[in-house]
Amino acid sequence: MSTATQSKVVGYLPQDRPPVGKMLLLGFQHVITMFPATVLCALLMHFNVSTVLFVTGLGTIVALLGAKWSMGNYIPLYYGSSFSYIAAVTMVINQLEPGLAFGQPASAATISVVQTGFIATGVINIIVGLIIRLTGGKAGVDKVLPPIITGSVAIVIGIGLGFAALGMASGTCCVPADAYTPQVSLTWWAVSTLTLVITILLSVYLQGKGFIGMLPILLGAVAGFLIAIPFGLVQPSFPSALITPPTFTFPDFTNPLTLSVMISVGIMAIATIPESTAHLYQISLYVDHLAEEQGREKLGLSKFIGLNLMLDGLDDLVNGLFGSTAGTNYGENNSLMVITRNYSGVVLITAGAIAMILGFLGPLRDAVNVVPTAVWGGLAIYLYGVIGMQGIALMIAEKVDLYDPGKLAIGACILIIGIGGTIGYPNGLPIPLLTGVFPFGWPPIATAALFGILMNLIFLAFKPPVVRGTDVLE
């Protein structure tokens, strides 16, 4: 097995195996990096934190081994919970089990129905990956899912969750109306706002500061927890047993809502496909740069776009089979690898194993549950906003022409249908069609995405006239 000790340049390529001690420490760093977002995502979607930690670790290992089996090397990516599915999942859970408090896990029966949506997501990713592998590129997929659609859907996902974030930050989501006094309101706002501001400052001023720069969300949550103590928002809890097995659930394809869930949740894959592709390009660039510095052969991981999406789908199948949230490869773990120059696949497998072990620790779950909702609300304002801004960043990076009336129309309709529907019709748009499939109403984000895809296909089939610049005036 080749190791980085063969070169004077420090760093580990995907095929390298560090010594055991370093391997454990580097793996634990990955777990700490993915922990805040993965846990928060589980709490927001009413999934069991311990189960999500265990299964995301398992999914990461399965994806890494799948790459090793398929191409003879690892694609160094860590899979955690995806925020792109929060709106679609919470809509389904609110239909099946309304009134759940923040962080309260849904029943096994409810989670089993949601899991079918993650199975659908996995299948979609695998199909798209196969198409790319067979056609030799992603140009065909970009025609059906251009950046104006994927970027607009990302904006909808983030901004559409704004109302929920403000409810958590203010306490209106959780405090009974008769107990919601001005003093209570001020207390919640104080804790959530201070948490938000501290987290933003940490994100801005710790960037580029090494490993600690990867932990602004975790540090912000700790700071918010400490702030909440004198405000009386921290409620003590009795510790669980040291070893508490995760609660595994399995997909329920017999529920009458299964088809509706598979459509409304599964289509969210269109938001994660461009994200995953961008992460692969990023990590491929840095891996090849390190290989060049070490005088070793470049791996060219960027040419495995199709395989990477198939592995994403494989990870989602694992999540959907055992009761975790839908996954995505984490940009924060990519950044950690760039900073530490450690791209070892074995280290990532070690990280997955550590996450699986943490899933059995009862006190860890207790520590997460004792953090006040106001603290999570402050973090949610920031994180949800970032999701929306990433959609804008995607369109800027892809140079989307918003002076093109077709693209402008697609983006405009996706935003209004998606955001307006998510906030105004949280249980679904009141469209009296296909009521057997969508008994509570059409899922807003899925409806917005499908409308955008349909309009784009019309424009592809019937090319509109190209009018630019002064031609408009003439």
Question: Would you name each region that the model predicts?
Answer:
Residues A109-P236, T350-G469:
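Membrane-embedded alpha-helical modules
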Residues M1-L77, S84-A108:
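N-terminal signal-anchor module of multipass membrane proteins
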Residues F47-L53, M71-Y85, D142-I149, G213-L218, ...:
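Short, non-helical or kinked segments that cap or interrupt transmembrane helices
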Residues S2-L13, R17, L201-L202, P216-I267, ...:
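Hydrophobic transmembrane alpha-helices of multi-pass solute/ion transporters
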Residues G21-A37, V184-T199, L215-P216, I229-L233, ...:
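Hydrophobic, membrane-embedded alpha-helices of multi-pass small-molecule transporters
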Residues L13-P14, V20, L43-G72, I267-G345:
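Membrane-embedded helical hairpins/re-entrant loop segments and their flanking transmembrane helices
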Residues M1-L25, V175, A179, F238-T249, ...:
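Intrinsically disordered, low-complexity non-transmembrane regions of multi-pass membrane transporters
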Residues V92-N94, N333-L348, I354-L358:
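Interfacial segments of multi-pass membrane proteins
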